[in-house]
Amino acid sequence: MAFKLKSLVVAGALLGSLVLAGCGQNEKDPKSIKVGVIVGAEQQVAEVAKKVAKDKYGLNVELVTFNDYVMPNEALSRGDIDLNAFQHKPYLDQQIKDRNYKLTPAGNTFVYPIAGYSKKIKSLDELQDGAQVALPNDPTNLGRSLLLLQKQGLIKLKEGTGLLPTVLDVVENPKGLKLIELEAPQLPRSLDDNKIDLAVINTTYASQINLTPAKDGLFVEDKDSPYVNIIVSREDNKDSEAVKQFVQAYQSDEVFNEADKVFNGGAVKGW
């Protein structure tokens, strides 16, 4: 009986050690963090933030790239990544409302102005009646684009629509423009479509075909835009030291200089 009891004690101790070891392996390294970014120009900027985070804080950053605006928040919500850096607050607010995400801003990055681009006309004076205008179809960037068209005098929106007007809120359209909603990643390619005369494109996607607002835009969003981009965390990790350090790294002169270069002066500090 004594031998049997001793064996059980030893076995229990070994099992406990294995459980503890397993728990230790599952614990997150406090000096490592996964950050979701959009492939392309924003990824280039984030690479500099990654280096600054390592050099200044000893933080190991793994960048996880995405090709659209939907999956980075989904991955963050699931816990596949720890942060993302690609969106402005109106977009995040809409995503939280639509999908009940427990996400929150952790810090500001840059304002990336949207602009109107065309391969068919050189100025808005050349825009013909009935022209087709491509716009992003997600609610916040659609609203942002419609407000920009209104500012150019191309349409008039119903009063009181705030930052989220839709095409149904257009009350005046003197040129009879046909407003075509597309997925944001499709907008750069739409410029080669014979049917599309003008496209309003976010700087992130415009930069993928080497377009910049200041040089190539027929009209550009003001730099005092409310659409400042943000770094986003979950509510359960927003106060972690790693999150704070990555935000500080992103808000460095080194990262601003890279963004200014990559976007040809199209990036404006949001902090």
Predicted segments, located by residue:
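C-terminal motif of bacterial Sec signal peptides marking the signal peptidase cleavage site
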Residues: 19-22
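Bacterial signal peptide processing site
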Residues: 24-26
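Short, polar/charged alpha-helical segment
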Residues: 32, 39-65, 71, 75-77
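Beta->alpha turn/N-cap motifs
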Residues: 40, 67-69, 79, 83-93, ...
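Short helix-initiation/N-cap motifs at beta->coil->alpha
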Residues: 63-74, 161-189
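A conserved helix-loop-strand patch within extracytoplasmic ligand-binding domains
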Residues: 106-155, 256
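Periplasmic-binding protein-like
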Residues: 107-118, 143-150, 207-271
